[in-house]
C-alpha cells in the first residue's frame, strides 16, 4: 500500500488494467447501490486523462510512482474520503461505506473510485470500472477464503486525491452460526412414560455449518442395544422401542461446532403401577366405627404415590364399596357402619399409572354389635289446635248487571272445619237452585246465576263450629241497564 494515489488515478478509470477476470470482484450494479450522498443514479463523468496516463509506468505497483507524470497541485485535487467503514461481510460479498472528503479541491469533487488488492499482492485492482457518485457500495461474487485490502479515492477533473485505506484486510469466509438447541415445551419438564411404551424425542437445533450432536445418559454413553439415535442437519432423534424403569434418568444432548457447544438436558421417568400396602391391621371397633392402620408398599412404581383407596365389604353381600380415595395418611377411621353386620376392609396403593393390581385385606372381621338400649319416653302434652271461626277476608259489596252471573267471596279460618251457611235478607238460601255455594280450603264462594233486580239485597255468610258462629254481611245491588 502507498499513500500516493496519483499514479492510480488513470488506472482506476481504465477498464483494461484489471487482472484476469476470475480474480476480479464484481461490484453491485449502480441501480442497487445506496447513494446517500449522490444527486442521482447517473454515473459521474470520467476524470480528464493526463497525457502521462498512457505511460506504462501507470500500471506498475503503487510503490513505484511514475516519474514522467507531473503531480497536480494539492489545492486542485480533493482530500481523502472520510470514515471508510466495512458495513457487512458474507461468504460471497462485502459492503463498504464512506463519507465525502472534507476538501473537494478547487475543481470540486465529481466522483469516487475504489480499488482492492489481495493480501500479499502489490497491484491495486479497480473494483468499479468508472467512478461513482455514491458513498456506499456492495461487491458480490467473491471467492471464499480471499483476503482484500480496500481503498477509496475522490476524483475530480484535476485528478485523484489521496486514498482512504482500511486498516485490516477483509476476509471472505463462510458465516458460522453458533449452535443452539431448541427444546420443545413439553420436554422442559420431566417426560413421563409407562413401562413398555416407546420413547421418541425429536430435538431441533441450529448451527452452520452442520454441527456434531451427541447424547449421554446420566453422564455415560448410551446403550446402543436399547437406545437408537439419529442426527440430521437440524435435529436429533432419540428412540427407545420399549421403555424400562432402568431407562429413567437425565439425557443430555450436546451440539458442537468449531469450539462452540450447546447443551440441553431432558429428564425421563419410566413408571409402572405400585405394589399393594405391606400390611393392614384392624386396630379397634366401637359403636358404628372401625379404626385401620397399614404400611406403605415396598414398590411405589418408580414415582410418588398419589394416595390410598380404602374399601369396605359386608360379609352378607360381599360387595366392595369405596370409603376413601387418594387418602394420604396410613391410618383412618371408617364410620357409619350398620349395626349387626360384619365388615372386612382392603387398601389399594395409587400413583400416576393408577391403582395397584392387588390390595391388602384385613384378616379379621369388624363386628358391629347391637347395644342394649332401654327406651324411656318422656311425657308429651298434646297441643290443642281448636280455633273458633274468624273471617280473614269479609264479603265486599258488589253491583251487578241483570242477566250476568256474579259471585261473592270471603275467607274463613277455624278448627274444626266450620259449616258455611249463606242467607239473603236473613233468610237461608241453602238448596235454592239459583244459588251455588262452594267452600274449599277456607275460601267461601256464592255464585248467583243470572241475577235480576229482585236479587238485590243483603247477603250474609255464617261460619258455624263448636267454638262459635260469626257472620259477615254485604250488599248486592242489581241495576237494570239503561235503554235508549
UniProtKB/Swiss-Prot annotation:
InterPro entries: FN3_dom, FN3_sf, Ig-like_dom, Ig-like_dom_sf, Ig-like_fold, Ig_I-set, Ig_sub, Ig_sub2. This is Myosin-binding protein H. PANTHER family: MYOSIN-BINDING PROTEIN H (PTHR13817:SF49), TITIN (PTHR13817). Keywords: Cell adhesion, Immunoglobulin domain, Muscle protein, Phosphoprotein, Repeat, Thick filament. The gene is Mybph. It holds the Pfam family I-set. Binds to myosin; probably involved in interaction with thick myofilaments in the A-band. One of its GO terms (cellular component) is myosin filament. Residues 80-175, 276-371 form the Fibronectin type-III domain. The modification Phosphothreonine is found at residues 2, 6, 26. SUPFAM superfamilies: Fibronectin type III (SSF49265), Immunoglobulin (SSF48726).
Amino acid at each position: 500500500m502507498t499513500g500516493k494515489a496519483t499514479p492510480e488515478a488513470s488506472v482506476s478509470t481504465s477498464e483494461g488494467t484489471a487482472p484476469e477476470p476470475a480474480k476480479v470482484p464484481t461490484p453491485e450494479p449502480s441501480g442497487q447501490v445506496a447513494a446517500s450522498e449522490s444527486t442521482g443514479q447517473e454515473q459521474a463523468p470520467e476524470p480528464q486523462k493526463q497525457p502521462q496516463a498512457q505511460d506504462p509506468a501507470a500500471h506498475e505497483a503503487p510503490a513505484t510512482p511514475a516519474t514522467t507524470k507531473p503531480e497536480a497541485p494539492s489545492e486542485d485535487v480533493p482530500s481523502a474520503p472520510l470514515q471508510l467503514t466495512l458495513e457487512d461481510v458474507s461468504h460471497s460479498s462485502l459492503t463498504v461505506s464512506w463519507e465525502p472528503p472534507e476538501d473537494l479541491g478547487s475543481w470540486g469533487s465529481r466522483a469516487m473510485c475504489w480499488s482492492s488488492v489481495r493480501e500479499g499482492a502489490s497491484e491495486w485492482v479497480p473494483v468499479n470500472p468508472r467512478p461513482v457518485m455514491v458513498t456506499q457500495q456492495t461487491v458480490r461474487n467473491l471467492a471464499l477464503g480471499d483476503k482484500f485490502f480496500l481503498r477509496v479515492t475522490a476524483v475530480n477533473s484535476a485528478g485523484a486525491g489521496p486514498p482512504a485505506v482500511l486498516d485490516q484486510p477483509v476476509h471472505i469466509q463462510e458465516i458460522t452460526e453458533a449452535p443452539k438447541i431448541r427444546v420443545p415445551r413439553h420436554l422442559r419438564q420431566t417426560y413421563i412414560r409407562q413401562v413398555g411404551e416407546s420413547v421418541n424425542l425429536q430435538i431441533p437445533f441450529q448451527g452452520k455449518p452442520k454441527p456434531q450432536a451427541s447424547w449421554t445418559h446420566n453422564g455415560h454413553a448410551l446403550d446402543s442395544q436399547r437406545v437408537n439415535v439419529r442426527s440430521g442437519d437440524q435435529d436429533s432423534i432419540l428412540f427407545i422401542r420399549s421403555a424400562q424403569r432402568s431407562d429413567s434418568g437425565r439425557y443430555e444432548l450436546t451440539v458442537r461446532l468449531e469450539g462452540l457447544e450447546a447443551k440441553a438436558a431432558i429428564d425421563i421417568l419410566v413408571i409402572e403401577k405400585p405394589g399393594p400396602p405391606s400390611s393392614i391391621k384392624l386396630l379397634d371397633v366401637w359403636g358404628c366405627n372401625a379404626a385401620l392402620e397399614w404400611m406403605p408398599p415396598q414398590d411405589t412404581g418408580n414415582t410418588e404415590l398419589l394416595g390410598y383407596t380404602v374399601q369396605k365389604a359386608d360379609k352378607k353381600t360381599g360387595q366392595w364399596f369405596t370409603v376413601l380415595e387418594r387418602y394420604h395418611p396410613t391410618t383412618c377411621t371408617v364410620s357409619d357402619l350398620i349395626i349387626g353386620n360384619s365388615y372386612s376392609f382392603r387398601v389399594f396403593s395409587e400413583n400416576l399409572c393408577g391403582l395397584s393390581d392387588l390390595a391388602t385385606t384385613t384378616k379379621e372381621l369388624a363386628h358391629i354389635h347391637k347395644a342394649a338400649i332401654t327406651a324411656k319416653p318422656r311425657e308429651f302434652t298434646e297441643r290443642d289446635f281448636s280455633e273458633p271461626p274468624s273471617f280473614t277476608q269479609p264479603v265486599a259489596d258488589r253491583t251487578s248487571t241483570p242477566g250476568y252471573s256474579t259471585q261473592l267471596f270471603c275467607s274463613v279460618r277455624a278448627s274444626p272445619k266450620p259449616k258455611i251457611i249463606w242467607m239473603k235478607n236473613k233468610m237461608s238460601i241453602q238448596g235454592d237452585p239459583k244459588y251455588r255455594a262452594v267452600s274449599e280450603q277456607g275460601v267461601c264462594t256464592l255464585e248467583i246465576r243470572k241475577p235480576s233486580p229482585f236479587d238485590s239485597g243483603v247477603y250474609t255468610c255464617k261460619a258455624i263450629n263448636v267454638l262459635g258462629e260469626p257472620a259477615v254481611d254485604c250488599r248486592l245491588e242489581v241495576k237494570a241497564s239503561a235503554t235508549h
